[in-house]
Swiss-Prot record:
GO molecular-function terms, A-Z: rRNA binding; structural constituent of ribosome
Family: Belongs to the universal ribosomal protein uS13 family.
Source species, domain of life: Archaea
PANTHER family, per the entry: 30S RIBOSOMAL PROTEIN S13/40S RIBOSOMAL PROTEIN S18, SMALL RIBOSOMAL SUBUNIT PROTEIN US13
Protein known as: Small ribosomal subunit protein uS13
Organism whose genome encodes this protein: Halobacterium salinarum (strain ATCC 700922 / JCM 11081 / NRC-1)
This protein's encoding gene: rps13
Lineage of the species this protein comes from: Archaea, Methanobacteriati, Methanobacteriota, Stenosarchaea group, Halobacteria
Length: 171
């Protein structure tokens, strides 16, 4: 491929592709670009690309607009064609349905769940309030947040040097 052909190919690429309130890197493959979307990992990205009928090794920015639209639709309707165990929100607390949340909704939903646990004063909610570990990890020796309490060797050496200088001047 000559340098002129390379420039023509580069001009056809969209460097940013907008899917689900997120700008995806158009220079990456479809699978890797979709994995940057919140709530979508490599496995989900592979299923979405196959469902949209897009080659997952193709460059994301090189896709036509209708192909990008089909990928967007496949991401939005992921729970309809994927197994229930692959959804990231199974048996939702409010609706009871399996959902797959993407984008910024992942963080918002997680924060709402934590706040609900705090409000009902569950064990996990109390642990979240106190800033302690929630999932049963040990806390005796790990996860200490305070500053280290130990011997500051430099301060001791400075004090000894001052004491030696003071002792040396008196003799």
């Amino acid at each position: 491929m000559s340098s002129e052909e390379q420039e023509d190919v580069d001009e056809d690429i969209q460097y940013f592709v907008r899917i689900g309130q997120t700008d995806l890197d158009g220079t990456k493959t479809v699978e890797r670009a979709l994995a940057e979307l919140g709530g979508v990992g490599r496995r989900v990205a592979r299923i979405v690309a196959d469902e949209a009928g897009v080659d997952r090794t193709a460059t994301m920015g090189g896709l036509e607009d209708d192909a990008i639209e089909s990928v967007t639709d496949a991401v939005d309707s992921f729970t309809e064609h994927a197994p229930a165990w692959l959804a990231n929100r199974q048996n939702d607390f409010y609706t009871g349905e399996n959902q797959h949340i993407t984008g910024t909704d992942v963080e918002l939903t997680r924060d709402q769940d934590i706040n609900r646990m705090r409000m009902i004063r569950s064990y996990k909610g109390i642990r979240h309030e106190r800033g302690q570990k929630v999932r049963g990890q040990r806390t005796k020796s790990t996860g200490r947040t305070e500053g280290t309490i130990g011997v500051n060797v430099e301060a001791i050496k400075e004090e000894q040097a001052e004491d030696d200088a003071a002792d040396g001047g008196e003799e």
